[in-house]
UniProtKB/Swiss-Prot annotation:
Keywords (A to Z) from UniProt: Amidation, Amphibian defense peptide, Antibiotic, Antimicrobial, Cleavage on pair of basic residues, Cytolysis, Fungicide, Hemolysis, Secreted, Signal
Protein name: Maximins 11/H1
Leucine amide: residues carrying this PTM: L143
UniProt organism field: Bombina maxima
Signal recorded as keyword: yes
Amino acid sequence: MNFKYIVAVSFLIASAYARSEENDEQSLSQRDVLEEESLREIRGIGTKIIGGLKTAVKGALKELASTYVNGKRTAEDHEVMKRLEAVMRDLDSLDYPEEASERETRGFNQEEIANLFTKKEKRILGPVISTIGGVLGGLLKNLG
């Protein structure tokens, strides 16, 4: 009788353990899906923000460029126009590539991924914004 009881309890414990392992695997796969969806949302928001900034800055730069085209240009004005054209090229190449593969992001949590995108934005936007500031400062100095 004791042997049957021990076998029955062992079987119940083994089946409960197997069910808990299966539930853990399902929970992990659901968590992976949620993390991937969050990552897509972060990328989408970043792309929309960058796209809006790019459009606004391009419009302002085109307006400034047309102002310079209509007036007489000195060597300094020509240099400013070259900088404006360089900024326009930088803005054209600023599009976010959707190349972040699952292998690259699988080991990161959401905060690390957000930090990576923030560092990338700072690395790209820093020089562009400083160049735009310098160009606008030069324009205001020349106009004033």
